[in-house]
Amino acid sequence: MLRNRVIRSAAFENMAYGNSPSQELTDYHTAVARGGVGMTTVAYAAVAESGLSFDGQLWMREEIVPGLRKLTDSVHSYGAK
């Protein structure tokens, strides 16, 4: 359950350097969570390298899972989803 109805919708942050979650991206979403939103969503991501539209865009692949887990755990630590 969300703690409230405030949701930060996905927007292109341009913080996925090397197409992987960066510390800057984690810090940004952590700050949003700390600010009280119920849920924050990370920007759109490519599911294949050929789907990348921009530098700084997430590319979903196995090796970025630890970075996404770090971001998720940090957001959850402040009560957001």
Describe the predicted segments one by one.
Residues 1-81:
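Flavin-dependent oxidoreductase catalytic cores
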